[in-house]
């Protein structure tokens, strides 16, 4: 019996959510451009769900927002939290109406593999630990990227980008002896350098998810 030419299966994907809090697109884009400048490769071609729950203006220019995001190589796949008027406008633009569901922590897959590196990760290098944790005995330099489907442990300074829970594991953590990162992300929730500085010093710490928000906890000496 020949294999069917297509199959329809259910799947879960982790998407970034862009919360729009102002109808002033110039102000929105100015802030977005500032964030993109800090981590351009992280957002390049990224699919986004746009949360419009703070927008009650029925004249909000959703088409303009879509075009502005596309010009920055960001892709709106749908909207959530919109009024009926904006939801109808979204449908004419070919955007899906996404209903937010309750997020529950998924247990890590078993068996869990661990990738161990005893070296510094330098600018321009990228390391990925698929289906497991990443342990680095060394520093992660500016411009370097370390990614893991599980947790990331860095026995040194984290100055580049670290993305844990890349496959959606919300129980993943990022631990480093010195938190000076350009970007940290767990299951799609991220902080840029400015966010990290607001919540942490340059000392050691553990970053994890608390609900849908990142938090950083000090490590015992």
From Swiss-Prot:
Record carries keyword Coiled coil: no
Xref: InterPro entries: CAP/MinC_C, MinC, MinC_C_sf, MinC_N, Septum_form_inhib_MinC_C
Organism listed in the record: Shewanella oneidensis (strain ATCC 700550 / JCM 31522 / CIP 106686 / LMG 19005 / NCIMB 14063 / MR-1)
HAMAP family, alphabetized: MinC
Gene3D superfamilies on file: 2.160.20.70, 3.30.70.260
GO biological process entries: cell morphogenesis; division septum assembly; regulation of cell division; regulation of cell septum assembly
Pfam family for this entry, one: MinC_C
Family: Belongs to the MinC family.
Subunit structure: Interacts with MinD and FtsZ.
Protein name, UniProt field: Probable septum site-determining protein MinC
Function recorded in the entry: Cell division inhibitor that blocks the formation of polar Z ring septums. Rapidly oscillates between the poles of the cell to destabilize FtsZ filaments that have formed before they mature into polar Z rings. Prevents FtsZ polymerization.
Keywords, comma-separated and alphabetical: Cell cycle, Cell division, Septation
Highest taxon of source: Bacteria
SUPFAM superfamilies for the chain: Cell-division inhibitor MinC, C-terminal domain
Taxonomic lineage: Bacteria, Pseudomonadati, Pseudomonadota, Gammaproteobacteria, Alteromonadales
């Amino acid at each position: 019996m020949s294999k069917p030419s297509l199959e329809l299966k259910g799947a879960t994907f982790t998407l970034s959510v862009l919360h729009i809090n102002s109808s002033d697109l110039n102000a929105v884009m100015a802030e977005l451009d500032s964030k993109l400048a800090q981590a351009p490769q992280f957002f390049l071609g990224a699919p986004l769900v746009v949360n419009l729950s703070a927008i009650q203006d029925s004249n909000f220019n959703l088409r303009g927002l879509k075009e502005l995001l596309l010009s920055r190589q960001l892709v709106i796949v749908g909207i959530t939290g919109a009024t009926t008027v904006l939801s109808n406008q979204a449908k004419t633009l070919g955007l899906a109406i996404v209903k937010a569901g309750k997020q529950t922590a998924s247990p890590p897959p078993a068996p869990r593999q661990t990738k161990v590196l005893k070296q510094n990760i330098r600018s321009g290098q990228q390391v990925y630990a698929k289906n497991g944790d990443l342990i680095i005995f060394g520093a992660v330099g500016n411009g370097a990227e370390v990614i893991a489907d599980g947790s990331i442990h860095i026995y040194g300074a984290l100055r580049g980008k670290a993305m844990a829970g890349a496959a959606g594991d919300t129980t993943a953590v990022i631990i480093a002896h010195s938190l000076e990162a350009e970007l940290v992300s767990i299951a799609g929730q991220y902080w840029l350098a400015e966010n990290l500085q607001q919540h942490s010093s340059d000392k050691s710490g553990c970053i994890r998810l608390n609900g849908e928000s990142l938090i950083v906890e000090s490590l015992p000496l």
